[in-house]
Amino acid sequence: MTIKPLIILPDPVLRQVSTPVETIDADIRRLADDMLETMYDAPGIGLAAIQIGVPKRLLVLDVTKEGEEKQPLVFINPKVVRSSEERSVYEEGCLSIPDYYAEVERPAAITVEYVDREGKEQAVEAEGLLATCLQHEIDHLNGVLFIDYISKLKRDMVIRRFTKAAKTRGAKAI
């Protein structure tokens, strides 16, 4: 397993819409393993493949509490098929937007259909942190960032801050 470098805002790669995974093979399973290692190293609780520059519909999560045994989850081609009308607000952060957090309102409960790392079709009903994290990571697969849910003024300030930091690093900007 390999820790991969993270794509950081304002890199335009983060706005790409990811393509479906066609075949679940050793390469996809290795990618999932690399993503989990990268996520744990960061440390984070979720990571979409696009965040390491791979535009595939693949994400990994682990929302276990610190001190509990790890429960890594792999979602291939995930799709939200049901969302509750009830909403919840969580303070979200993102490994691609380091050290910035904002409250985001999303459906409180969702049902997601996906394919697991063995190629089996699955469905999960999620609420709480798992629902929020799944929605956040699925957004990444669609080129959407959590800052898209905050006011334009705040979003523009965040993008300016990260664009300025990217220029000092010599990185690409949106």
Swiss-Prot record:
Free-text comment on the cofactor: Binds 1 Fe(2+) ion.
Known catalytic reactions: N-terminal N-formyl-L-methionyl-[peptide] + H2O = N-terminal L-methionyl-[peptide] + formate
Gene Ontology terms for molecular function: metal ion binding; peptide deformylase activity
Cofactor(s) the protein needs: Fe(2+)
Listed EC numbers: 3.5.1.88
Matching InterPro entries: Peptide_deformylase, Peptide_deformylase_sf
Biological role stated in the UniProt entry: Removes the formyl group from the N-terminal Met of newly synthesized proteins. Requires at least a dipeptide for an efficient rate of reaction. N-terminal L-methionine is a prerequisite for activity but the enzyme has broad specificity at other positions.
Name under which the protein is recorded: Peptide deformylase
